[in-house]
């Protein structure tokens, strides 16, 4: 039920969009002059494709405790409560850069705004299950899955950074 609740909020509706998080990306794209069709039909970067394949494999082939640990830590990456000493989670830090360096407002970057807040709830959503079930001999593999997921996330982010460096100014 918790997984379905999480996916419902990401794909269907939550406090930030009546149409799911893709709608937030489309709205944010308008702020930078990207049309909805360009977003929907975008060819993924190789690093993005590899990361999505890795996460897909993790969630379909690994034991559920490892899958859950691997996916939960991606929510932690956006949790301002956990990363306040670093300036906040990934979405908050990116939003601050967009606002400071390019003059955007929170309203113009709804995907970043939503993820700077929604992922706090998502960070907590599965912890009781991990605390109960990722114990004993299941603890170390769950921790390793979380570490692997962080590596996948770093690869994904690096791919975006490399692509951004190629954009002519």
What residue spans do the PLM features occupy?
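Non-heme di-metal
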Residues: 1-169
């Amino acid at each position: 039920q918790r997984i379905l609740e999480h996916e419902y909020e990401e794909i269907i509706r939550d406090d930030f969009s009546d149409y799911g998080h893709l709608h937030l990306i489309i709205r944010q794209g308008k702020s930078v002059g990207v049309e909805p069709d360009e977003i929907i039909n975008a060819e993924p970067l190789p690093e993005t494709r590899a990361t999505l394949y890795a996460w897909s494999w993790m969630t379909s082939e690994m034991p559920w405790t490892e899958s859950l640990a691997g996916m939960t830590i991606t929510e932690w990456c956006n949790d301002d409560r956990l990363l306040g000493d670093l300036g906040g989670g990934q979405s908050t830090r990116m939003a601050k850069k967009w606002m400071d360096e390019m003059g955007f407002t929170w309203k113009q970057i709804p995907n970043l705004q939503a993820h700077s807040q929604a992922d706090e709830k998502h960070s907590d959503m599965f912890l009781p299950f991990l605390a109960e079930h990722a114990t004993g001999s299941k603890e170390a593999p769950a921790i390793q899955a979380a570490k692997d997921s962080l590596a996948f996330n770093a690869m994904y982010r690096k791919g975006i950074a490399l692509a951004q460096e190629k954009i002519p100014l």
